[in-house]
A protein has these predicted regions:
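Transmembrane-helix motifs of polytopic, lipid-linked glycan transferases
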Residues: 90-112, 149-154, 295-298
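Signature aromatic-anchored transmembrane alpha helix within multi-pass, membrane-resident enzymes
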Residues: 2, 172, 189, 193, ...
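Membrane-interface transmembrane helices that cradle and orient dolichyl/undecaprenyl
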Residues: 79, 109-115, 151-167, 177, ...
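Hydrophobic, aromatic-rich transmembrane alpha-helices
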Residues: 99-101, 193-205, 275-320, 355
Length: 624
């Protein structure tokens, strides 16, 4: 049964990748792992920052000493590299999915010594929606689960049988977990070691030799991971994730994913809310949903005094407890309804084992009742799984325009993506591989340094990549919006450079006013707009100091001019460089509206393709 389960999980993963995730998933960790894979395939740990780390930094990555590198450890990207060397990186994902299902079978067989229970547990795991939903994405949760389950089995059997190879394998498996998800290695280590120590507590000296053999497998991988840290961060004990953002760490306090995002206080109250939200969605991704939870509780209660069942219960509770103090629990809980509670994936193996114990126990006494329960488990899960897969399919389709928008480019190009802070955060296909020499160089719209980047690449045609919806509308949701993505040629302008166009009163506003700012300082005082007004603003009249500048034309609304000046509504932004008695600007510039996003407490600038009441452009003589 074990080979059949592994093969079925492997095939399921490949099918789901093709049918549900044709254009990746909503989770932007995926493109980071794929970019990391490309870097490793090139024989590198990092890539050059091109002198513009603020423009070229991908999501969940760090910049240091002229280099850019992923915040993640190498364990999972190396698996993807192996798959790509075999011809298809998806093979690594499929192998991780198979490992999780096979690991469930192996652990339950080890704990119950009953292959029927193990086979049923493996089937239940395979049929749980979490396998289909997570088995098609380039994320490491199922892979790490498989490693952890096999680690426990190898450790237990190695100690029991005095098997050196099993003990070394146990250490190697735990080492690869450390190489993949360092924090998880500590949790899995405790789950494996504590039951063994308790069982052998009357002869602890006998565990010294097994521990030494485990160390033989563990320590080399730990050493490699620490050497990678030393190479990238300058310290063996500092991981790339804290270089990416020092506030991305375990424990309560001020926390943040990346420096350009808002920080927030993560404390016990928010941790409890987040854990509760994850716990609420957990059953929906388990075979039988809440019926499955009830049966798992029955199985745990019926054999509650058995150490094997106690270990399954501990496995089910360990990760929710361990991740309680990690702020990622809050962030992941916001999308748990879409893809499951990702940090709690190990709990599904434990729950399936307990359900299998309950069903086989019922089957011995009342076979008919057990059969009915098994059918009900499937009937409950089918509509839930179908619904979740359909939502994820739509979320994947919403990514597609980002890829297709650049397919027609037949010459070296520089594509400036939406101003969301980091490459890959909105456009999952916008990475630069292992160097900056690809046909398309992607850069973020993170300030006037974009103009310098365009000047430095005269061999590339520059384009502005924009969607017809603001970034906030493209975040993952139950009802994803598929954007239309446009590429607009960018051009450097000089000569008699000026902002030219018209501004109109905003309908419904008591007073509309416009003003101009340079680098967030007012250069033109607010002027009332009571009818369509022509604007002609020469850059040479702004007394710009030599260097790069951001020029904003703003329109506000209010009861009078002064009030309108404190309530901006529309903005056109341009980047210029002053020097040598001339000014060079980058057209066409960007547009934005000052709105309050859904669920937000404060308004913010949201990107727009056009502004009906502020139609101004940068006008001048092309300089290239």
């Amino acid at each position: 049964m074990l080979p059949a389960l592994a093969v079925a999980a492997f095939v399921l993963s490949l099918v789901v990748q093709e049918l549900v995730y044709p254009s990746l998933s909503w989770n932007r960790d995926e493109p980071v792992y794929l970019w990391h894979m490309e870097v490793l395939r090139a024989g590198q740990l990092a890539v050059p920052d091109g002198g513009h780390p603020d423009l070229l930094l991908p999501w969940l990555s760090a910049a240091r000493d002229g280099e850019i590198f992923s915040q993640y450890s190498l364990g999972w990207p190396l698996v993807l590299v192996l798959g790509s060397l075999l011809g298809w990186s998806a093979l690594g994902v499929a192998a991780g999915t198979a490992l999780a299902v096979a690991g469930t079978w192996v652990l339950v067989e080890e704990l119950t010594a009953d292959r029927r229970v193990a086979s049923l547990a493996g089937l239940l795991m395979l049929a749980s929606p979490i396998i289909a939903v997570q088995g098609g994405v380039y994320l490491n949760y199922l892979f790490t689960l498989g490693l952890g389950l096999l680690f426990i089995v190898c450790l237990r059997r190695g100690v029991r049988k005095g098997s050196i190879w099993r003990l070394v394998a146990a250490g190697g498996l735990l080492g690869w977990i450390f190489f993949t998800r360092p924090f998880d290695a500590a949790v899995w280590g405790l789950l494996g070691a504590v039951p063994v120590v308790l069982h052998e507590r009357h002869r602890l000296r006998a565990l010294v030799r097994p521990a030494a053999w485990c160390a033989v497998g563990l320590l080399p991988l730990v050493a490699v991971a620490l050497l990678v840290n030393l190479r990238l961060t300058g310290s063996p004990t500092e991981f790339p994730i804290t270089v990416a953002d020092p506030l991305d760490r375990y424990g309560f306090g001020m926390r943040r994913l990346m420096p350009k995002f808002d920080d927030f206080e993560y404390g016990p109250r928010l941790a409890a809310i987040s854990t509760g939200r994850n716990a609420f969605w957990l059953p929906f991704f388990l075979i039988g949903a809440h019926l499955g939870i009830v049966l798992a509780m029955v199985g745990a209660w019926q054999r509650r005094r058995e150490a094997s069942v106690q270990l399954l219960v501990a496995l089910g509770a360990a990760f929710p407890i361990a991740y309680f103090m990690f702020f990622g629990t809050n962030i992941s809980s916001l999308t748990a309804r879409l893809s499951g509670p990702i940090y709690y994936v190990p709990a599904y193996a434990a729950l399936c084992g307990l359900i299998a114990i309950a069903l086989t126990g019922i089957g011995r006494r009342r076979p008919g009742a057990a059969a009915i329960l098994a059918v009900l488990l499937v009937l409950v899960s089918v509509p839930i799984a179908g619904n979740r897969l359909l939502v994820n399919r739509r979320l994947s389709e919403a990514n597609e325009p980002w890829a297709t928008s650049t397919e027609a480019l037949d010459e070296p190009a520089l594509v400036v993506t939406p101003p969301d802070g980091y490459l890959l955060f909105v456009n999952p296909f916008g990475h630069n591989g292992a160097d900056l020499e690809g046909d398309v160089l992607f850069a973020m719209d993170n300030g006037p340094d974009v103009l310098t980047l365009v000047e430095e690449h005269p061999d590339r045609e520059a384009y502005l990549q924009r969607a017809d919806r603001p970034v906030v509308d493209l975040l993952p949701s139950e009802h994803p919006q598929t954007p239309e993505v446009e590429l607009t040629p960018m051009v450097l302008l000089g000569g008699d450079l000026r902002v030219s166009g018209t501004v109109e009163p905003i309908p419904g506003a008591d007073t509309t006013a416009w003003w101009l700012m340079v680098d967030d300082e007012a250069r033109r005082a607010p002027i009332e707009v009571d009818e369509p007004l022509a604007l002609e603003i020469a850059m040479r009249d702004l007394d710009l100091e030599d260097g790069l500048h951001t020029v904003d034309v703003l329109v506000g609304r209010g009861g009078n001019v002064d009030e309108a000046a404190t309530h901006p509504a529309l903005r056109r932004r341009f980047y210029v460089r002053a020097g040598d008695d001339d000014v060079v600007g980058l057209a066409p510039g960007t547009a934005a509206r000052f709105l309050r996003p859904p669920g937000a407490s404060d308004p913010e600038w949201l990107e727009a393709l056009t502004l009906e009441h502020l139609r101004v452009d940068l006008v001048g003589t092309p300089v290239r």
